[in-house]
Structure formats: C-alpha cells, structure tokens
C-alpha cells in the first residue's frame, strides 16, 4: 500500500486508474487534461470561457465517497438532461462546475468545493488553470503521403482518418496548475495512462511545469499502456510504437515501471523486444492480467494489485530523481469521440 497516489490522464483511462488507486489509499489526486472541445464540455468552454468540465466531472465521480451521500451525489453529478432544449446533453456536474468556477473565480476552488460535497478525500485538479487546444500534424490525408495536414481540436484529432504524427499544445508552454505540481512532488506513486495517447496522455508531458515535476519528484513513476489501439488516434499502433511516440514528445522523460496487459503481448520474443525498447525510458516492463474479461477496459481490482506490487517491491529503493533543469512554471478505457464523457 502507498500513502499518496497521483494519476494523470483523462476520460475513461483516468477513470480506471482512479478506481484502482482508491483501493490502495483514499489520498488520490487526479490531474486531468483540459483540452476537450466536444459535447457539453465544448459548448460550455465556448460559451462561458471555462476549463472544460467533462473529464474533471468524471474524475470526481470516480473518487466520490462510498457512503450513501457520496453515491447519491455521484449519480446526480452524472445525470444528463434529455430533451431538445438548451440544456439537452448537459450533465448536471458540468453545469455545477461551470457555475462554481464563475462564482469562486477559480477552477481549483470549484473542484475542491464539489469534491467536499461528494466526500472526496483526495483532489481533482486541472493540469493547467486555463483551457487548452491540441494541434496535430496528420499524414495520410493528402495525395502525397509525405505531406502533413495540421488538425486542430481534440475531437478532430481523435476522429481523424489520417495518422497522427505529432501533437502540441496551444498556447505554447502553458502554465501548470500549482497544486498539481505540489501533488506530484509529494506523491509516493505517480501513474500516467492509460487513455487516448495523443489527447489524454502525452499532453501532460508537454506542459513544462508538469514535465519538470515528473523529472524532479522522488515518487515512483508508472506508465500504464492501453489494452487496444484506438480507432483514429492510434489505429494500427503496436505497443512498442506507443512507447516510441511518448519518448519522441518528451525527450529525457523516464519512468520506473511500464504495465502492459499480458494478453496483448503473448509471445516471449515480442516481450523481449519491448523490454529492450523500454530501456529508452529507463523502465522495467511488467506483463500482467489487468483487463476486464470481454472488454477493452482495465479491471480496477487487477490494476490495483499490480500497482500495489510495483510499490511494495521497491519502496525507498528507486533511483534518485533527476533534478529539474528549469524553474517549474505554475499557475501563470472510452474513445474521446464519445460524448458520454463530456
């Protein structure tokens, strides 16, 4: 068991990690991507200029207290209005977060207040205090296969029929949320992934403050790989390709452990190749049964057991962290096309 876990991601992948982490400790901090531009989140960020609330709402629901009060409020948070009027498609939680953010003039204060109502013992934090956009270089959309097309927006990137080659954040070098940096520095375990690789996982290492904190923290760092490649973003990607893409976007980024579902890499030959590839992240690879049978989803209980084992085998024995080379700038699972998360 570990005392403090920080999970970075968004959408269904982050929900799975949080559901696993809370089995190990009540003190879980979610650091959530803030680039969603679809569904209810997209409408609210456009109309009210707020941080998109959908993934933040889902993280709060994942960490809500198991008490009757907490479960009731988690259900309320997730309730989505029907009909065809102005509120159609909006979850109550999205509207509450948008309203609290306006009243309190601070998205972190809004999340803390709603977390208090739900009985969350940890925290849910945006990775940046402002809404971001994701921009991608995509190939395969032009007659000349060597040509890239610039695609902007999380939904457009997640659903492109082309091949995503590289992503970047707008604005460039955005500030990290101060409380997220503090949580990473104080954690015992930091978990990145699973999730949409280009729009939920990689954005965290593109925020200078978060990247610096991940290098500087003494926490054990684990990377959880997806169970399957996603249509659109990573269609046709091998497990090895996921690692190469992460390393390409974050030179010098390292983790201690990479967790891969055993069924995804059945042959010893492939596993040995992955172990060699993982050395570029200075990581040890763990092949384990972490899938929910018959689904492309992680099983929270199985994932919790693997994370617990990773911590138990090396508590206090990890390599000293690489010191950050710059001041840390702060404050200034489902496919992302699924509106159920927004």
UniProtKB/Swiss-Prot annotation:
Gene3D superfamilies linked to this entry: CofD-like domains
Name of the protein: Putative gluconeogenesis factor
Organism field: Mycobacterium tuberculosis (strain ATCC 25618 / H37Rv)
Subcellular location, principal: cytoplasm
An MF annotation (GO) of this entry: LPPG:FO 2-phospho-L-lactate transferase activity
Cellular compartments annotated: Cytoplasm
Phosphothreonine: residues bearing it: 325
The protein's role, per its UniProt record: Required for morphogenesis under gluconeogenic growth conditions.
GO biological process: regulation of cell shape
Keyword annotations of the record: Cytoplasm, Phosphoprotein
Keyword Phosphoprotein: yes
Family: Belongs to the gluconeogenesis factor family.
């Amino acid at each position: 068991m570990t005392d403090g876990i920080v999970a970075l991601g968004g959408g269904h992948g982050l929900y799975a990690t949080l559901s696993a982490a809370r089995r190990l400790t009540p003190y879980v901090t979610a650091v959530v991507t803030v680039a969603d531009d679809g569904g209810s989140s997209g409408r609210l960020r456009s109309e009210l200029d707020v941080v998109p609330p959908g993934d933040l709402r889902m993280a709060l629901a994942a960490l809500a207290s198991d008490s009757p009060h907490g479960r009731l409020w988690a259900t309320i948070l997730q309730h989505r209005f029907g009909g065809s009027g102005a509120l159609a498609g909006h979850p109550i939680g999205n509207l509450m977060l948008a309203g609290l953010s306006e009243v309190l003039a601070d998205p972190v204060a809004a999340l803390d207040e709603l977390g208090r109502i739900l009985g969350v013992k940890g925290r849910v934090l945006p990775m940046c205090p402002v809404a971001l956009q994701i921009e991608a270089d995509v190939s395969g959309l032009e007659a000349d296969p060597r040509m890239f097309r610039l695609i902007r927006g999380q939904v457009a990137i997640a659903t492109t029929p082309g091949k995503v080659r590289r992503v970047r954040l707008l604005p460039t070098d955005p500030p990290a949320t101060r409380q997220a940096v503090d949580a990473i520095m104080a954690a015992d375990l930091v978990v990145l992934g699973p999730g949409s690789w280009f729009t939920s996982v990689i954005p965290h290492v593109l925020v200078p403050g978060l990247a610096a904190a991940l290098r500087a923290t003494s926490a054990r760092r684990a990377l959880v790989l997806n169970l399957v490649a996603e249509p659109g973003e990573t269609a046709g990607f091998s497990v090895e390709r996921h690692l190469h893409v992460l390393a390409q976007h974050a030179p010098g980024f390292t983790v201690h452990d990479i967790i891969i579902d055993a069924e995804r890499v059945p042959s010893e030959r492939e596993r040995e190749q992955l172990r060699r590839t993982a050395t570029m992240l200075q990581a040890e690879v763990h092949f384990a049964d972490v899938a929910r049978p018959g689904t492309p989803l992680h099983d929270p209980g199985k994932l919790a057991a693997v994370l617990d084992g990773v911590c138990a085998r090396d508590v206090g024995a990890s390599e000293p962290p690489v010191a950050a080379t710059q001041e840390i700038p702060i404050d200034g699972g489902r496919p992302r096309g699924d509106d159920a998360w927004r």
